[in-house]
């Protein structure tokens, strides 16, 4: 659920971000566009890349890129750096949604796969509603940069968990 979470968590920080970066409200709103366009485009490629290179490798690369992109956002000194960080977040944040579904198809079938995908869909439905609340809560204690540090830490935990526990589900001979 990192993709939907990354879209909405920072929304409560828009005014503070505009002030600190010396950016207009429109420029801050454009950070959503810089995120969503690569997010949508890469949804077409994550599956293809995982079919060719393996599921685990693509998930790990996507999470690593998301961590680095989140840190770039957190330490942005101008709106252009924030735009770049958001674009890189968008490129990488959909990897779990696409490749995760492929991994489920690799190992589960029928009712088992449907049950797991229903649980995943529930997480994707909850994330957009919960993430602005989380962002607002973080703003009580940190400035807007803390939200991106939080996203980097969250993705780092997922990255370590995947490194330790996530197996490759697509055998080399089945790769295309």
Predicted features and spans:
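Flexible cytoplasmic inter-helical loops of multi-pass small-molecule transporters
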Residues: 163-176
């Amino acid at each position: 659920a990192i993709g939907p979470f990354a879209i909405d968590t920072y929304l409560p920080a828009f005014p503070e971000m505009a002030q600190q970066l010396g950016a207009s409200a429109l420029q801050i709103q454009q950070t959503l566009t810089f995120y969503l366009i690569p997010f949508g485009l890469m949804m077409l490629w994550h599956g293809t890349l995982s079919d060719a290179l393996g599921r685990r490798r693509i998930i790990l690369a996507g999470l690593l890129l998301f961590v680095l992109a989140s840190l770039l956002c957190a330490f942005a000194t101008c709106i252009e750096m924030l735009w770049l960080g958001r674009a890189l977040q968008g490129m990488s944040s959909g990897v779990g949604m696409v490749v995760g579904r492929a991994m489920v198809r690799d190992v589960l079938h029928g009712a088992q796969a449907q049950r797991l995908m229903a649980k995943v869909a529930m997480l994707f439905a909850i994330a957009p509603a919960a993430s602005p609340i989380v962002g607002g809560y973080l703003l009580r204690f940190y400035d807007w940069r803390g939200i991106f540090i939080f996203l980097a830490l969250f993705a780092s935990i997922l990255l370590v968990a995947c490194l330790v526990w996530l197996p490759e589900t697509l055998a080399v001979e089945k790769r295309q």
